[in-house]
Amino acid sequence: IMFVLEKIPLGVTSMIVCIGLVVTGVLDVKTAFAGFIDSNVILFVSMFIVGGALFETGMANKIGGIVTKFAKTERMLIIAIMVIVGLMSGVLSNTGTAAVLIPVVIGIAAKSGYKRSRLLMPLVFAAAMGGNLSLIGAPGNLIAQSALQEIDMKFGFFEYAIVGLPILIVGILFYATIGYKLLPNHDVKDEGAFDTEKDFSDVPAWKQWLSLIILVLTLLAMIFEDKIGIKLCISGGIGALLLILTGVISEKDALKSIDLKTIFLFGGTLSLAAALQETGAGELIANKVIGTLGENPSPYILTFVVFILCCILTNFMSNTA
């Protein structure tokens, strides 16, 4: 209920969950807070820093500007925006990608005379769809990974793309055809905080290119995890450390790029999952759900029910929660 209502910040709710489980004796301190030292949390923190360097140096801004520059019409511009945002969201923060490119798109809209609302809506949808391209594309992907690791299974780095890439392609095609006619044809009257595009002219070019090189090398290490024998979280940690040690990003900016709400929410969710498993409540809930679908429910029907339930809940609460 607290996750749905969000009367209390989600990060605080997660801490209440952890502390409450200890106070009530459901879990011991070590188990209740084990989620915060999970390997996937370390991966989260590392990739927030690696991705943050691309934003802080202006390299993400530059990539977005170069791609959109080649679009000659509004329709082509929408396609270009969705392609670059979708691909970047697959390996970087969805929110960060959108936040960095929104001022770029607003600037393009002002220069070209296009309505900003017609460009921003496809951008936001592309950021959401792009998160399904890789294991690190969205927090929910790593939560599922943590659940699988409990039974010695895991997703491949780009395994989500089997479903995510077709969704992104269909989304782009939709906005290039039918959706193009449905886009809002009005402009925003209020001047928002995103109107001012950040100036990166004083950032040395070597920092921009090194941030991109380290990101690419980090991703390659993750893709070939099994061959090189280095875990995802370690590859991410090495990339984050290199960025700080080489001076590409300062310690202050590195810490600023970490989304603490996501980290607390992730850790608290893992603790809650541990409590459900320890007490048998998880099995009880699962049996009740399966029982409502009959003695031997089809896995397709069960998946459909869970899918619809998630689709409904995500309209009222955080996707990650």
Labelled PLM ranges:
Residues I1-I8, I84-S93, F125-I136, A221-K227, ...:
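Transmembrane alpha-helix interface/packing and boundary motifs in multi-pass membrane proteins
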Residues I1-V45, I49, I162-N287, T303:
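Hydrophobic transmembrane alpha-helices of multi-pass small-molecule transporters
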Residues F3, L27-T31, L87, A128-G131, ...:
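Residue-level signal for pocket-adjacent positions within structured domains
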Residues K7-L10, N94, A138, F157, ...:
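Conformational gate/switch positions in structured elements
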Residues L10, V29, F55, S134-L135, ...:
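Short, electropositive, low-hydrophobicity segments enriched in small/polar residues
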Residues G11-V12, I16-I19, V23-K115, S257-T262, ...:
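Membrane-embedded alpha-helical segments and adjacent helix-loop junctions characteristic
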Residues M76, S112-F125, G130-I143, A147-S201:
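Juxtamembrane and boundary regions of transmembrane helices in multi-pass small-molecule transporters
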